[in-house]
């Protein structure tokens, strides 16, 4: 069952075929609950840290939380993209302003990866939008149902699948799109690292289930072995690197890559038990990672 909140409809969005529609399903309930519980715990755990310009710091943290909540509840692809950026952009400023000595290099790498992923996703979103059926107020629509039923050829679905998957794989991250993560985690302030590792990586996993599986089922079947292979390589590689780390943040980064690889591989098995396991793993991983601090 879905609970929809559609009390706000901006006319400019409506004429683009987009409505500000938020909803909750089983997966959304779990991740919004995790986000709602995690942030107060993070604030309590790091309350002894004296941040310069603390009001701006906590304001950006709360903006990140708002973006995460929106990602997990958006029932419209354009609204989803808006909240995706709303979650990512404050994280960049948190790391670049309040991070460690090498924060500039780390956040530059973070910016390049996330900007590339966002650009690829935006291209895919526009292409999908142009192939949706007309809505009541616009020629095309960004609504979930319209996107799910977009009229695309098999070849089009294949290359758009990769646009979305690379964008989501960068955020998870999945090997070989992971190289931004260890440096960013190490240089970011502890509270930001807790958000990045405990919650934000779930954005990519959630997005694969929410958008890729329903929109590109044939492409998922065609490329599942490639994705599972990359995920398994990432699991083994990251696990071996993690056990050699003497820095907690880098250990968390590499161990998260291994956990996310397991989740991604499970998703692409396309089995019900695999998806159920991913949902449990997402929640438990978030609790465990945040609890480590």
Where are these regions (language model features)?
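Short hydrophobic alpha-helical membrane-embedded segments
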Residues: 54-63, 253-257
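Hydrophobic transmembrane alpha-helices and their helix-loop junctions in integral membrane proteins
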Residues: 43-47, 66-78, 91-293
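Transmembrane helix-loop-helix hairpins at membrane boundaries of multipass inner-membrane proteins
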Residues: 1-59, 138-149
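Short, ordered loop/turn segments at secondary-structure junctions
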Residues: 82
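Short phosphate-coordinating micro-motif centered on Lys-Gly-acidic
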Residues: 85
């Amino acid at each position: 069952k879905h609970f929809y909140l559609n009390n706000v409809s901006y006319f400019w969005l409506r004429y683009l075929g987009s409505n500000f529609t938020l909803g909750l399903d089983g997966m959304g309930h779990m991740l919004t609950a995790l986000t709602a519980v995690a942030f107060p715990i993070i604030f309590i755990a790091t309350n002894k840290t004296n941040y310069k310009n603390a009001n701006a710091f906590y304001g950006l943290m709360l903006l990140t939380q708002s973006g995460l909540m929106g990602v997990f509840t958006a029932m419209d692809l354009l609204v989803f993209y808006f909240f995706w950026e709303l979650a990512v952009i404050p994280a960049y400023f948190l790391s670049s302003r309040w991070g460690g000595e090498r924060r500039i290099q780390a956040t530059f790498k973070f910016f390049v990866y996330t900007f590339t992923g966002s650009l690829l996703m935006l291209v895919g979103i526009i292409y999908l939008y142009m192939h949706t059926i007309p809505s009541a107020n616009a020629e095309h629509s960004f609504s979930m149902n319209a996107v799910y039923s977009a009229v695309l050829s098999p070849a089009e679905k294949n290359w758009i699948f990769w646009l979305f998957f690379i964008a989501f794989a960068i955020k998870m991250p999945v090997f070989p799109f992971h190289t931004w993560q260890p440096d960013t985690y190490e240089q970011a302030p502890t509270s930001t690292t807790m958000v990045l590792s405990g919650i934000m990586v779930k954005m990519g996993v959630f997005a694969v289930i929410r958008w890729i599986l329903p929109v590109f089922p044939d492409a998922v079947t065609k490329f599942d072995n490639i994705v599972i292979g990359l995920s398994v390589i990432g699991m083994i590689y990251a696990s071996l690197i993690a056990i050699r780390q003497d820095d907690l943040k880098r250990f968390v980064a590499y161990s998260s890559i291994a956990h996310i690889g397991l989740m991604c591989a499970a998703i692409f098995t396309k089995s019900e038990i695999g998806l159920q396991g991913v949902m449990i793993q997402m929640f438990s991983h978030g609790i465990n990672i945040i609890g480590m601090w």
